[in-house]
């Protein structure tokens, strides 16, 4: 192995949709056998790290410790803590994203939050968009969990978190700070979690 540690994309490296990618599975097993540190990095905010861990074990034959899974949700929280703008937030997103941000000590504020965080929300509606728009107009820091405009589903390419952010950007004329891949924030945070220098880390991705 060339590097002292690896960042591994899930979709396209370990699986494609529900289909296993044997080469990705074999690569992770090699890292584990050689005790080379690695971190799975994913833009998905609808799954908690525990859910990702269970999915990898149950569907893709990869047993991995919880601390080897780094999601855009975790990177978003790390970024919010670093920014230190306050402990209030309005979140558009799945229950997992909202719960994780609350667990990190951020209190929901629908009027004047320090942050507006927008991730994938299967039940988004006009009122949620309105609350976010008004808060950003008042000065809330606008964060997008990831810029993915579409997500592949069995029905076809559906709107992703990036599409929801684009609507709010159009309404506020404020660009969100995107956390997830391919942006630098999630990768910088992941590198910090591995505790290695950038040049010592390889990346396994599509």
Q: Where would I find each of the regions flagged by the language model?
A:
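HAD-like aspartate-dependent phosphatase fold
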Residues: 1-10, 14-205
């Amino acid at each position: 192995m060339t590097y002292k540690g690896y960042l591994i994309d899930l979709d396209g490296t370990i699986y494609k949709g529900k289909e296993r990618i044997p080469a990705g599975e074999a690569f992770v097993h090699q890292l584990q056998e050689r005790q080379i540190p690695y971190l799975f990095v994913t833009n998905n905010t609808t799954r908690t790290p525990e859910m990702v861990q269970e999915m990898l074990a149950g569907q893709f034959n990869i047993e991995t410790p919880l601390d080897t899974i780094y999601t855009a949700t975790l990177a978003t929280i790390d970024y919010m803590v670093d920014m230190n703008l306050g402990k209030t937030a309005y979140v558009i997103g799945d229950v997992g994203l909202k719960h994780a941000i609350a667990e990190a000590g951020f209190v929901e504020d629908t009027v004047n939050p320090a942050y507006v965080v927008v991730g994938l929300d299967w039940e988004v509606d006009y009122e949620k968009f309105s609350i976010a728009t008004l808060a950003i107009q008042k000065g809330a820091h606008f964060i997008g969990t990831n810029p993915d405009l579409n997500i592949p589903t069995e029905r076809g390419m559906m709107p992703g978190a990036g599409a929801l952010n684009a609507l709010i950007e159009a309404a506020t004329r404020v660009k969100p700070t995107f956390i997830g891949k391919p942006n630098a924030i999630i990768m910088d945070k992941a590198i910090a979690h591995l505790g290695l220098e950038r040049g010592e880390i390889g990346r396994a991705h599509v």
